[in-house]
């Protein structure tokens, strides 16, 4: 997992509440176990027509939002069935940060475990950023300071547990954390 201490990116507004994991990555694309290659299927039924052409009315197909790396979404993002493929698809597409008023618990934890910074933010602030995204809003997200500075100069703070913050800043996934204790594990195993 790549360390994430600071990220500056363009905002893509997804003004929808209750976006579930099947909408994020439909079930027909879950047959693979590698973590890469899922970005092309992100929001598949919203992004593409039945004939495979892009739908011009979906935000990810809008040229103004190409290259966005911060997704600002509606309430209860990531609800529905538990599937780790959802954060894989978001990360593979290029999203590093997702901001919403609330997240489904399992999605929230899966996203953090896969290196995506998920930030719970006041609904009024989320709506404000969605509106400003039309004018090319960028956000500077400082995980160390736990602040977000918008391109209009406003600064907002956010909360994250110290444990999750340290994991993201250092790029530690669960395996990396286990390997940090390799000597203690080996000592325990040799003693028992």
UniProtKB/Swiss-Prot annotation:
Q: Does the keyword Lyase apply?
A: yes
Protein keywords: Amino-acid biosynthesis, Branched-chain amino acid biosynthesis, Leucine biosynthesis, Lyase
In terms of InterPro entries, this protein maps to:
3-IsopropMal_deHydase_ssu (IPR004431), Aconitase/3IPM_dehydase_swvl (IPR015928), AconitaseA/IPMdHydase_ssu_swvl (IPR000573), IPMI_Swivel (IPR033940), LeuD (IPR050075)
A single GO molecular function term of this UniProt record: 3-isopropylmalate dehydratase activity
* EC assignment: 4.2.1.33
Which GO cellular component terms, listed alphabetically, does the Swiss-Prot or TrEMBL entry include?
3-isopropylmalate dehydratase complex
Q: Which Pfam families match?
A: Aconitase_C
User: What is the catalytic activity of this protein?
Assistant: (2R,3S)-3-isopropylmalate = (2S)-2-isopropylmalate
CDD domains, alphabetized: IPMI_Swivel
Per its UniProt entry, which superkingdom is the organism in?
Bacteria
List the NCBIfam families.
Answer: leuD, PRK01641.1
Its family remark reads: Belongs to the LeuD family. LeuD type 1 subfamily.
| Oligomeric form and interacting partners | Heterodimer of LeuC and LeuD.
Protein purpose: Catalyzes the isomerization between 2-isopropylmalate and 3-isopropylmalate, via the formation of 2-isopropylmaleate.
**What's the protein here called?**
3-isopropylmalate dehydratase small subunit
Organism, scientific name: Oceanobacillus iheyensis (strain DSM 14371 / CIP 107618 / JCM 11309 / KCTC 3954 / HTE831)
Q: What is the lineage of its organism?
A: Bacteria, Bacillati, Bacillota, Bacilli, Bacillales
């Amino acid at each position: 997992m790549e360390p994430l201490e600071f990220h500056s990116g363009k905002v893509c507004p997804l003004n929808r509440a209750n976006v579930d994991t099947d909408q994020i990555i439909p079930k027909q694309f879950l047959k693979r176990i590698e973590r890469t290659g899922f970005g092309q299927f992100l929001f598949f039924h919203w992004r593409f027509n039945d004939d495979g052409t892009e739908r011009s009315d979906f935000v990810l197909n809008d040229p103004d939002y190409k290259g966005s790396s911060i997704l600002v979404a509606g309430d209860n993002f990531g609800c529905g069935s538990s599937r780790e493929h959802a954060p894989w698809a978001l990360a593979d597409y290029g999203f590093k940060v997702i901001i919403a008023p609330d997240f489904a618990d399992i999605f929230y934890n899966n996203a953090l475990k896969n290196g995506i910074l998920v930030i719970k933010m006041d609904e009024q602030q989320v709506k404000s950023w969605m509106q400003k995204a039309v004018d090319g809003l960028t956000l500077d997200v400082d995980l160390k300071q736990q602040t977000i500075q918008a391109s209009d100069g406003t600064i907002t703070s956010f909360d994250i547990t110290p444990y999750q913050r340290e994991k993201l800043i250092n790029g530690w996934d669960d395996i990396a954390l286990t390997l940090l204790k390799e000597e203690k594990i080996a000592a325990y195993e040799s003693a028992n």
